[in-house]
């Protein structure tokens, strides 16, 4: 009987990418297949996030629930990976003695060896070292599921914002060699991937050697240009970027590379220079707005999303008003916004914070409501227009229909003859948007490529 692995992912897209790699590593080494049901699993892994306290505590809550599964199935192995593992290390085993494996983001490729050591010794295995780029040298080729894929181009972050734990849990910035990234993207394209999202904690800081050991360096703009030249790749996205390193070279890339989507996630974190300074972000609101102004001069239709922290220590009503003014001016088309959560070991955790929780919550609700209104307005403005989408697969709402994604990252559901589904999936097609809903759009097929056209008859 085929053994199975269950992975629960918390947090960012980097973690989603790492979770897929965990499955790939265990499939290549031990033939394990992925399952969506923990009760069916022989190995249960939690890929964790420590950016906010709530996410961290939820991991231990989930661990408590799977403990019962291990009692019923003694051979079951339980592992904790990701940023909580990197931060907490062996203390996870002290708190939850039934955990067998603790590994960091940089050591997931060692899972097979850790499993062997656990079975041989009967003792929990902990490996949260930072072996830099070694991870990518030991990962098997990706197994593609659909026409979109993530590709990690670098690890870690060297910005050390005062509130952020990432540099301590993922290490400093280390870039993959250019040819290594291009080889992975080309392999994905050969398997039918049409859209890649280049991943990193701060992709703007990418400085990859042209080849392993080379002293010649490629910046992020160069990487994008090379990826765009790979046959089969139709769209390029990236996340996450940092305003401080959004260079003119990168801005100019939006004029040179049509495959680079007109959708940008650029975290601002706050709209007050005073708070940005306390956060150690390294830029002002005016500098942030200057980047967006230059980008929109090239791409007037640029869709913008961001991250925002409400209730940072010392935030006044005036600071929050400045944040809201920026929201209105930028016209954000999504924001990942949260109340500030102090993380142990970060400088901001020691700052005095006298703003009541109720005030922070009220501010957050106001911010999120304003952005939701803007999201609805943008979605409604798309009704009646023809949008180019990448068809990703059957619709979640109705498997008899198909779903694709627009450049500004909206899901579009549309009807298509069942016989055409296999041929349409993975293609770029045009749809006319007929309806806008809170979290999706609905449209109709209006124009497809010659290959897809024959599939609809």
Curated annotation (Swiss-Prot):
Its EC number is 2.8.4.3. Residues 380-447 form the TRAM domain. GO terms for molecular function: 4 iron, 4 sulfur cluster binding; metal ion binding; N6-isopentenyladenosine methylthiotransferase activity. InterPro entries: Elp3/MiaA/NifB-like_rSAM (IPR006638), Methylthiotransferase (IPR005839), Methylthiotransferase_CS (IPR020612), Methylthiotransferase_N (IPR013848), Methylthiotransferase_N_sf (IPR038135), MiaB_methiolase (IPR006463), rSAM (IPR007197), rSAM_horseshoe (IPR023404). Keywords: 4Fe-4S, Cytoplasm, Iron, Iron-sulfur, Metal-binding, S-adenosyl-L-methionine, Transferase, tRNA processing. Its main location: cytoplasm. [4Fe-4S] cluster 2 binds at residues 157, 161, 164. It holds the Pfam family TRAM. It catalyses: N(6)-dimethylallyladenosine(37) in tRNA + (sulfur carrier)-SH + AH2 + 2 S-adenosyl-L-methionine = 2-methylsulfanyl-N(6)-dimethylallyladenosine(37) in tRNA + (sulfur carrier)-H + 5'-deoxyadenosine + L-methionine + A + S-adenosyl-L-homocysteine + 2 H(+). Signal peptide: none annotated. Belongs to the methylthiotransferase family. MiaB subfamily. This is tRNA-2-methylthio-N(6)-dimethylallyladenosine synthase. The gene is miaB.
């Amino acid at each position: 009987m085929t053994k199975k692995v269950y992975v629960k992912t918390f947090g960012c897209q980097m973690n989603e990418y790492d979770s897929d790699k965990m499955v790939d590593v265990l499939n290549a080494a031990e033939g394990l297949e992925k399952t969506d049901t923990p009760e069916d699993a022989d190995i249960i892994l939690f890929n964790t996030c420590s950016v906010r306290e709530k996410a961290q505590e939820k991991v231990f809550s989930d661990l408590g629930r799977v403990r019962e599964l291990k009692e019923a199935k003694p051979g079951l192995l339980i592992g904790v990976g990701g940023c909580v593992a990197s931060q907490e290390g062996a203390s996870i085993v002290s708190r939850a003695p039934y955990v067998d494996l603790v590994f960091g983001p940089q050591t997931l490729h060692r899972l097979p060896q850790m499993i062997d050591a656990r079975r041989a010794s009967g003792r929990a295995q902990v490996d949260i070292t930072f072996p830099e780029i070694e991870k990518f040298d030991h990962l098997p080729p990706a197994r593609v599921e659909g026409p979109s894929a993530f590709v990690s181009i670098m690890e870690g972050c060297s910005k050390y914002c005062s509130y952020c734990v990432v540099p301590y849990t993922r290490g400093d910035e280390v870039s993959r060699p250019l040819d290594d990234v291009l080889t992975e993207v080309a392999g994905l394209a050969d398997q039918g991937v049409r859209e890649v999202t280049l991943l990193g904690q701060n992709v703007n800081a990418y400085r990859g050697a042209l080849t392993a050991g080379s002293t010649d360096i490629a910046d992020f703009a160069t990487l994008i240009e090379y990826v765009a030249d790979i046959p089969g790749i139709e769209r390029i996205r990236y996340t996450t970027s940092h305003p401080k390193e959004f260079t003119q070279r990168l801005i100019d890339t939006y004029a040179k590379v049509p495959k680079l989507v007109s959708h940008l996630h650029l975290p601002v974190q706050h709209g007050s220079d005073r708070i940005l300074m306390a956060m150690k972000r390294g830029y002002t609101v005016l500098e942030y707005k200057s980047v967006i102004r230059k980008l929109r001069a090239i791409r007037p239709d640029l869709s913008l999303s961001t991250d925002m922290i409400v209730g940072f220590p010392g935030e006044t009503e005036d600071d929050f008003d400045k944040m809201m003014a920026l929201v209105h001016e930028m016209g954000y088309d999504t924001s990942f916004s949260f109340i500030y959560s102090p993380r142990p070991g970060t400088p901001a955790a020691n700052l005095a914070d006298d703003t009541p929780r109720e005030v922070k919550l009220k501010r957050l609700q106001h911010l999120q409501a304003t952005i939701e209104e803007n999201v609805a307005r943008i979605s409604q403005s798309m009704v009646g227009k023809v949008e180019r989408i990448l068809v990703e697969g059957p619709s979640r709402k109705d498997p008899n229909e198909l779903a694709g994604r627009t450049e500004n990252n909206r899901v579009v559901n549309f009807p298509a003859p069942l016989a055409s589904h296999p041929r349409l999936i993975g293609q770029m097609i045009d749809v006319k948007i007929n309806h806008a809903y809170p979290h999706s759009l609905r449209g109709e097929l209006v124009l497809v490529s010659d290959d897809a056209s024959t599939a609809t008859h």
